[in-house]
């Protein structure tokens, strides 16, 4: 984990683990402290990542959020994709943005890449998470175990050719 500035962390393999829940499914958990965090999985070669990354970085320093970035093609992050494929948040495309509550995935951002839309996503997700008791927030995650990337989506860059079609 590399802290570039207040509120921005660069995560890598060692920052993630698979955690089994009561339903015998696995969540891709991270070790970042704080109640709320947003993790953006990206690559440097993805055009849509270049559009969305400045929007995510706008929230660096927000006292409620910890903003995290993971370059999935970085040498220190190469195990994250295979690990995620065993979880409720399979990483099959980028940008892939996950809102975490207490280190566990809670909701995936799949909206339009605008600052207003992303801000509304954050506010709505915090409201939803605050209505759930802290110890059960991850268990009631909106991310179903069968979640997959949107096929033929122009909003993402698929990590494998087979997943795009």
UniProtKB/Swiss-Prot annotation:
InterPro entries, alphabetized: Thioredoxin-like_sf
Could you tell me the superkingdom of the organism this chain comes from? Answer: Viruses
Q: Which Gene3D superfamilies match?
A: Glutaredoxin
Write out the similarity annotation: Belongs to the IIV-6 196R family.
Q: What is this protein called?
A: Uncharacterized protein 020R
Naturally occurring in which organism (per UniProt):
Invertebrate iridescent virus 3
Tell me the classification of the organism that encodes this protein.
Answer: Viruses, Varidnaviria, Bamfordvirae, Nucleocytoviricota, Megaviricetes
